[in-house]
Every structure is written in C-alpha cells, then in structure tokens.
Amino acid sequence: MNNKLPSAIGVLFIHLLLSSMIFGQSLTPEEKKIVDAVDAQFPEALSLLERTVNIESPTENLTGVKQVGSLLLPEFNAIGMKTRWIEMPAGMKSAGHLYAETGGSRGKRVLLLGHMDTVLAGEKFRREGDKAFGAGTADMKAGIVVLYFALKALHSAGALDDTRVKVLLTGDEEDTGIPIMTSRASMVEAAKASDLVLSFENGGNNIATVARRGYSDWQLEVTAKTGHSSAIFKESMGSGAIFEAARILNEFYVTLKDEKYLTFNPSIISGGTELTLGDNGSISATGKGNVVPARLIVRGDLRFISEEQKAAARAKMTEIVSKSLPGTASKITFRDEFAAMSPKQSNYELLQQLDKVSQDLGMGKIEPLDPGERGAGDISFVADLIPALDGLGATGGGAHAKGEFVDLKTLTQQTKRAALLIYRLTR
C-alpha cells in the first residue's frame, strides 16, 4: 500500500490545514460564534431576499415600498431593536423611511444605511445556481439582507444588546424626495449622533467604497430671433437657437471632458419654433425646415468628486453659456441632487479596519474602488459629517435593468465581513 498522497491533494490538504490554523488564531471565540451564526442563517437570508424582491417597490410605488418596510420592521424588532416608520409629507411622493436602533452604551456609535426602493418593477425572484435574479436584487435588497443578518448574527452571539447601532433604510434613494432638507433630515440627525456610517450598496469582489461622486442636474435654455431661414447668419437674424446650443455643448465637451472624475451628460434635447413642456418632464418641439429655430432646451447631469470640483465646473459652464452667438440668448441653471462623498483619510482608516477583518477571515485584502466606477448614493448626504464607508453589500450585476442579479456566494461572505466589522467597532 502506498501511504503517500498524490502531490496535488497533499498541497491542498496542507493549504486547508494552514488556513484553518490562521483563521483560528485570528478570530476570538466570540467572533467564531458570530461567523458560525452567519453560516447557519443562510436559508433564512435567502428567504428574506426572495420575499423582499417579490414586493415591487420602485420609488414611485409608495405602497410597495411601505410593504417592504412592513416586512422588515418585525425582523429588526425580533433582534431587540426599537423601530419606527418615518413618514414624509404627502406632496413629496416619498414612502418614508425605516428606522431602528439598539439601546446600549458600548463602543462606537454606528449608523448603517440602505434603501428599500428600486428603479424597475416586474421581474420576480428566481434562482439559477449561485445567482438570484429579480428587480432590485443587487441594488439593493441583497444589501439589506447583508445588513440585517450581520446584526442578527451579533444578536445570536449575544454581542448586539449593549451596542449603539442605528439603522436607516430610505424609501426614495433612487429618486430622492424634494426638498432634500426634508427627505434627508432624519439621516443627517442620525449621523450627527453617530461616530461613523456604513452603507450596504452592492460591493464584494474584495473592494469597498471610500468615495462616491456627487450628482447635479442642469438645464440649458436658448432663445433666438426667428424668421425665414434665408436670413440666417445675417445681422438682422443671427444664428438661431440650435447653432447656439451646438456651440455650447461642443465647448462643454472640449473644455471639461478630460478632467478626472468629472462627467457631464446632455441627456435630453429639443428645439424648434415652439416648445411644449409636459407635466412628466417631457419636451416636444415643432418647427419647419425654412424657419430659424426660436427655442431650445437641453437637460443633463453633472457628476463630481468634490464640492470644489462641482463649483469649478459650473463656473466654466456658465462662462461658456454667456458667450452667445449673434441673435441668441442663453442661460443655464443647476439643481443639487447628491453631494459628493470625498475620499477623506478617515474613510481610508475605516477601509483598513474592514481589510483587517477580511484577512482575519481568510478572504483576502480589500482595496478601494475607483470613484469613477460608482454613481451617487445616500451616504453622500452625511459623508462630510463622519467617517464613511460604502459597498458593504453583496456583489451583483445588471442594476437598473432587466436581468439584474446578485451573486449568492457573496451574500454570506459580505455578511461575515460586516458582522465582524460592526462587532470590533462596538467593543
């Protein structure tokens, strides 16, 4: 009988043995209990994900968003947290927010963020191997599941009771209620009473988010002299609204396109002799080929890494707009939506703590995600107040589109990371 293992099997055995030894040395007995609790909870986590995904909750479906909240409130109550629903004024078209908190006095005060609303509706939950499909799976109902079951694992291990943890799940992240000072008042209040904030937007793949770009709307309005097209470019007529808009958009492109982390997208344009503005934000134009266009509107967005970058970009855009072609007049207006989550040193320090957790779990290093790869998010409203880290949710793809999915292998992985990070922060 040959007592030697084949070399490949032997190497694998030694690797597993060493990994087990390292894992055992890195985690305390209580931390091992938390990790074991996460593993044991996977069937429950999958069930909660399915139930939340099967509730259609696009932002404008206020009833659906509230149904998600009604499903989650008793779950947080079951792990000893006090809960309430934060209503928004009726005219804001926002379902409101779910708030939960522990009543302890130990460790850092931790604020956890997520959102219950989605962009699309209609695609029900289905599982195909290690992937779960459905509207809002990745963005971000799986993130809510990670957040909740991280806390439940702490509760199961007796490590949640004396902590100072707040949870805020918004109902309008995908289309923020206006005015923002009202829709995000509870978030700002919670942040001011916290030492740090963690957000559970989709993440995984050994990356986390220390910075997110802000988001702003802009609208360009052009008016011009109108008349028979045979007179265009003459001093008496000028250049028309469409040539003026083309000049402005081209100068935006030439002047701003190469600035790092800055993007601007003219998404809607309509121009002609007359414009009609619809209640739903639509713009329609009429005109004739032999008439110089009198009006034009362009709408778009602006994304930026800091308030300073936003202000500088707006100043350049305003200057470009002011240099009108003959016979035209233009103005540009801006509207704030999401502030930027700038890459502060304190955010990187939180990332280092998550990286230590990940390596202690044997899951590898955590690197910061390039801010250019991520859009705006709720955490940006409070990231200037306290240290902030995002991207703690599960990995997925196809967000805001049919075929959206979450990688179920990362559901447990991310829950373990989040649970141990919260545990260490609250000791």
Where would I find each of the regions flagged by the language model?
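Acidic-glycine-rich active-site phosphate/pyrophosphate-binding loop
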Residues: 116-128, 211-222, 356
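Extracytoplasmic/secreted envelope proteins and their assembly/folding machinery
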Residues: 46-50, 69, 73, 148-151, ...
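Acidic/His- and Gly-rich active-site-bordering loop/insert found
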Residues: 25-135, 155-160
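Positively charged n-region of N-terminal signal peptides that target proteins for export
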Residues: 1-7, 162
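Bacterial N-terminal signal peptides
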Residues: 10-21
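Acidic/histidine-rich catalytic neighborhood of metal-dependent amide-processing enzymes
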Residues: 140-217, 271-278, 426-427
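Active-site metal-coordination/substrate-binding segment of hydrolases
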Residues: 106-169, 190, 402, 407-409, ...
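Metal-dependent amide/peptide-bond hydrolase catalytic core
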Residues: 25-29, 33, 40, 57, ...
